[in-house]
A protein has these predicted regions:
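Surface-exposed, glycine-biased beta-strand/turn segments
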Residues: 45, 49, 83-193, 224
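Zn2+-dependent peptidoglycan hydrolase active-site motif and core
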Residues: 175-212, 239-248
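A structural signal for short beta-strand/turn segments enriched in small hydrophobics and glycine
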Residues: 180, 219-231
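Short, charged beta-turn/beta-strand-edge "cap" motif at the junction between a beta-strand
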Residues: 188-190, 228-236
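Conserved small/polar residues in nucleotide/adenosyl-binding loops
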Residues: 257-264
């Protein structure tokens, strides 16, 4: 009897796996057209935990361009890309789902694939360098995308926070994660001292709550890894230079604009 039950359970598991696999390659698509636009908060959260090298490797194994592979993976795995989800998506599944996305939503698919390709190409380094001194200092990542904020009225946090383990302003260098051009620099009520860098791919990278700046001006070009300033706790005030209303951290965000002159006045902690 126990042996029969085991066979029944095994058969049910096989059927379940086959159904899940088939959902990626045939039948109805697991999303609506709007899901492949920036109106999709899950897409905007950018929960990607793969390095550029890992993404390139998995894309090559599936014989797909980097952007198309990453877009397909995000759709297949509920907008999460990490080693586990990448390894679970087979070459056959990836190609089949990519082809269906192109067939049903070509404009949206290619636009989002271009965005993902741009992000992977842009991001060359982590914005906080590893400490080389005797006193090792590091940071903690806080996935605070979409969390509630109340300063200036109820709103949602649009970005992510890199928190300083040593809660002292002015000691953690902030590096440009990408090459690009300084588009904005100066004080914002919410973001404090901030700087915005626009890459050649048209993506705007926003660094907020700085304690001080490197000698940079609007229009200057920067390279990936170049010093932008130092991490701080500025902001939440119309008075320029206000500090200390929250812990030391870097607010980091990536923005897309249809205008050639990005504005980040709504960016917030």
């Amino acid at each position: 009897m126990k042996k029969s039950r085991a066979y029944v359970l095994l058969a049910a598991l096989v059927v379940f796996i086959c159904i899940c696999t088939a959902s990626l390659t045939e039948g109805r698509l697991p999303l609506k057209r709007e899901a492949l636009t920036l109106q999709n908060d899950n897409l905007r959260a950018m929960r990607i935990e793969l390095t550029a090298e890992e993404i390139a490797q998995y894309a090559d194994e599936c014989n797909l361009p980097v952007g198309e592979y990453l877009c397909t993976l995000m759709v297949a795995e509920n907008w999460t890309a990490d080693v586990q989800t990448a390894q679970s998506l087979t070459h056959k599944q990836a190609v089949a789902l990519r082809n269906r996305l192109v067939r049903h939503y070509p404009e949206e698919f290619y636009k989002m694939s271009s965005l993902y390709a741009g992000l992977v190409a842009d991001m060359q380094c982590f914005p906080i360098p590893v400490s080389k001194g005797n006193e090792q200092m590091w940071v903690e990542y806080c996935d605070s995308w979409g969390l509630e904020r109340t300063y200036g009225g109820e709103r949602r946090h649009e970005g992510t926070d890199i928190m300083a383990q040593n809660n002292t302003p002015g000691i953690y260098p902030v590096l440009s994660a990408t090459a690009g051009t300084v588009t904005n620099i100066g004080w914002l009520e919410l973001g404090g001292w901030r700087i915005g860098i626009t890459s050649e791919n048209g993506i705007y990278y926003y660094y907020a709550h700085l304690d001080s700046y490197a000698p940079l001006s609007v229009g200057d070009t920067v390279t990936a890894g170049q010093l932008l300033g130092f991490m701080g706790n500025t902001g939440y005030s119309k008075v320029e230079g206000t500090k200390g209303k929250f812990d030391v951290h870097l607010h980091f965000g990536c923005l897309l604009y249809t205008s050639p002159s990005p504005r980040d006045k709504r960016q917030s902690r």
